Amino acid sequence: MRPLASTFALHVRPGVRVAALTSIAMLAFASNSLLCRLALQAGRIDAASFGSLRLVSGALMLAIVARAGARRPAPPADWPAAAMLFVYVACFSFAYLTVSAATGALILFGAVQLTMFAAGWRAGERFAAIGWAGFGAALGGLVYLVSPGLAAPTPRGAALMTAAGIAWGIYSVRGRRPVDPVAATAGNFLRAAPLALALSVALATRFHVTPAGVVLAVLSGALTSGLGYVLWYAALRHLTAMRAAAVQLSVPPIAACGAVLFLSEQPTWRLALASAAILGGVAAVLATRARQAGGSR
């Protein structure tokens, strides 16, 4: 049995395949945000337990998928990637206890963009003029989307969300290296899960779970995190760091639209205009061939 990403790769043209993998991954990221909001903001589970269940369930799901599709030796352990995955999950969960959703999105994705753009620039990646214009439109649309409900975050919450964004940016940059995305992601989850469990033990006095909270955490881990990250790793092999950074700006408007559909939040013209700016800007970035400093690629 072949892994989903490998089977998909055999029957679809490369450009279409990358676009499809990226789009599905962004939907998974947005769904993950919705699940996290449902679980944490409603007090259905404590942040440490949510993070632990998310990583453990993701590790179990990915172990099953990796074992079913194993065709090559396991890749070497990538402890830095596993550590970044743990830092992202832990900081993200705890930040949303004190930071509003709109403010958190701006801090998180701002940190991701700066981290991945810095990595891309250091590696010699550059955009053509239309690519920079598209990125500016997408970033401006994101600020426009979240600014109406922007609330001053607590220093602790802002620091945690910034750390989550930096960790996710580093994790994504490292994700461009693996040849086997399923095995690499499974290994990262497997090594990050004990770190999350250790944190839960250290914070045992805050332990609080409900059946609904457990279900939401498992869905977040096994589906929108575990399998979603496999698709993201598969797409990352064909994206520059700067393109990968830009495309993630599409997650906030997708999540906002999901909140309208599934959380009964009211649609607004601001949401429609911001979403158009973000998605149009991302499309411009993806349509522009990235180049290396001093020459094209």
Where are these regions (language model features)?
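Specific transmembrane alpha-helical segments of multi-pass solute transporters/efflux pumps
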Residues: 28, 69-109, 116-117, 137-144, ...
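Hydrophobic alpha-helical transmembrane segments of multi-pass integral membrane proteins
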Residues: 17-20, 48-64, 131-137, 156, ...
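Hydrophobic/small/kink-forming positions within alpha-helical transmembrane segments
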Residues: 30, 34, 56, 63, ...
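Membrane-interface helix termini and inter-helical loops of multi-pass transporters
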Residues: 34-46, 97, 143-156, 200-218, ...
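Glycine-/small-residue-enriched transmembrane alpha-helix faces in small-molecule transporters
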Residues: 1-52, 83, 90-91, 140, ...
